[in-house]
């Protein structure tokens, strides 16, 4: 942290925060049997392993237990954030009572698990991944690109018994991250909507897998899919790759709050 005061209520702050996971937790469902096969969905042939579901072993026999989730340790994770802040407090003159504050923070946080669930099975089920049992590093749910915060307050002292305060706060930020996943069970682990999707670069990569659905032909289905990819900033930038966990970011949100309070002593 660096704080510098220039006198007369001026303060400049600079902050750098770095953290590194040493013994963080990730979840391994040892009740699953991993086959020697891989899912061919247009991407790398060995990126997504295929599982034989919960309820059968190597020979296809029904197992007595499922959802056996083991908590393991991982050191794959870190975060880095920087904040710059300016403060001005008018202590005399015509603007006495006015306080101004402005800050900008940016950085990123990456880890194996978000830690948003208190139950081990839920933490395993709802983590978007190529392989739900692997130490895959992705953006954490709380990772943000940037946040601008501007605030101003003014207190008018009418007498020694009464004062009115006015406050204004403006924020510009990206409210959340999200993942692009298949609507189904792509890797046979008996969980739905947690398999990160492959973002096709062209029609040839998906023509063996793409079903027409409500469209008249594969070509028409591809035109609709391609148009969706093109209009999305994240998907269009990562063609030919697997989507990252929490890789996509919501558009900037703007929030303005106004407050007025009156104090009587």
Enumerate the language-model features and the residues they cover.
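Short, solvent-exposed micro-motifs at the edges of structured domains
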Residues: 13-265
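Single conserved hydrophobic/aromatic residue that forms the stacking wall/gate
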Residues: 1-12
């Amino acid at each position: 942290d660096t704080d510098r005061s220039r006198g007369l209520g001026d303060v400049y702050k600079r902050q750098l925060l770095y953290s590194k996971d040493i013994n963080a937790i990730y979840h391994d469902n040892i009740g699953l049997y991993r086959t020697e096969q891989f899912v061919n969905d247009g991407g790398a042939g060995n990126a997504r392993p295929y599982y034989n579901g919960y309820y059968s072993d190597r020979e296809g026999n029904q197992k007595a237990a499922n959802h056996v989730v083991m908590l393991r340790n991982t050191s794959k994770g870190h975060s880095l954030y920087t904040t710059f802040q300016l403060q001005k407090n008018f202590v005399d003159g015509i603007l006495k009572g006015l306080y101004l504050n402005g800050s900008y923070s940016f950085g990123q946080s990456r880890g194996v698990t978000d830690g948003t669930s208190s139950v081990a099975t839920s933490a395993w089920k709802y983590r978007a991944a190529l392989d739900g049992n692997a130490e895959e590093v992705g953006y954490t749910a709380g990772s943000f690109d940037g946040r601008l915060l501007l605030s101003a307050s003014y207190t008018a002292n009418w007498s020694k018994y009464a004062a009115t305060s006015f406050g204004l706060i403006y924020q510009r930020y990206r409210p959340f991250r999200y993942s692009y996943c298949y609507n189904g069970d792509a890797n046979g682990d008996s969980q739905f909507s947690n398999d990160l999707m492959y973002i096709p670069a062209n029609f040839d990569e998906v023509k063996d897998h793409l079903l027409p659905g409500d469209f008249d032909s594969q070509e028409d289905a591809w035109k609709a899919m391609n148009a969706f990819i093109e209009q999305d900033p994240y998907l269009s930038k990562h063609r030919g790759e697997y989507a990252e966990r929490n890789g996509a970011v919501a558009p900037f949100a703007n929030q303005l709050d106004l407050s007025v309070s009156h104090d009587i002593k």
